[in-house]
């Protein structure tokens, strides 16, 4: 898992790269970024992915989208974002995502997920795995596994997981979900989302070059193909759509639910898996997830990639996947990290994007508005990192600023940012990119058929609290994980 220092002891583990015995042998790698386990990184290995046509991950714009991020005052920018047009070599398909890292190496985790999750999603979609009968199959494997566990604590935790998942799932646009009208595309993409998220999290644990034990990231992602929209969400980043109501008034529609520990179903799952959920006295509005016998790490979300110190205690990486068929009244979608939602309401965000001088500047206008709101509302708090993706659903507007030459337009100094960004990442870059038909992530972790069925069943039954728009943090400085990290036990 790499070398980790506890809050109580600053001395490194014997045999770690920080110990005196390694001071000579490791001298050549002394400039390696903390948290990275692979020092043989070559920037050229990232170039194929960075140069894929239609893929934009730095501040810029195209005819249909714009993205922008700004570093806060809490350290490295842990937010990442991507827009990928012609996704999977499909001319009518676009992938968008924002990722909010947290923990000591959250910026590395967010960038790794940004780069690898779309490839896995495209690969599973490309494989066209048959899903008829699988999504509706109810197996007894999970229950049987629970009854066969000898350890009472483990059996109770597993039984709690099953019980929590038996409740029906309700996503932000549940009224749109009628299985009789959902196209086959949704069923295929839903399984692809579930597989990709599962394998991505496993890869972070077993084959990642970044220490994810106490670090992780959120992910709110979408695939738009024609008039069909599929959204997959983990964590407390959010997707909101600007659409016209019956009176032609622009209104905000929240497409995702902030998956935080304050949701009853999420809290129940965590507690029954022996995790603890409570808020600190200084910030009673923010429920956090804690280890059973240790006041750490204090994670402010119920689902996330990474954070493996909590994965045995109720934290999961299963996405909430929802479907929506777009209409001519739907104008744009905004994906943003909690640095935006902590200080701006859904209505504020939709109004800012709609009133932006041009489509190319909408994301930047939104981020800058959020930064001003932070300074105005919480002058004594540090501004959080902010990242936003604005996807326009009707590209025929003559005000749409960009041409092909403006795709992934870099501002002054961003060429250096690109190099620094990739150097901060791990060494496992793709070896080449043609059609995204394989998962390019080093050693692949496959899911067998029974595991896939179980995964889909669990995702179908995960419950979110209906009928409520869950706002983000109100009035305190945002920290997703506290600084007291659990001690690394040698040999585990």
UniProtKB/Swiss-Prot annotation:
Binds 2 magnesium or manganese ions per subunit. Gene3D superfamilies: PPM-type phosphatase domain (3.60.40.10). Mn(2+) 2 binds at residues 100, 338, 384. Residues 24-35 have a biased composition (Basic residues). InterPro entries: PP2C, PPM-type-like_dom_sf, PPM-type_phosphatase-like_dom. Its cofactor is Mg(2+); Mn(2+). Residues 1-46, 406-468 are annotated as: Disordered. Keywords: Hydrolase, Magnesium, Manganese, Metal-binding, Protein phosphatase. This is Probable protein phosphatase 2C 33. It comes from Arabidopsis thaliana (Mouse-ear cress).
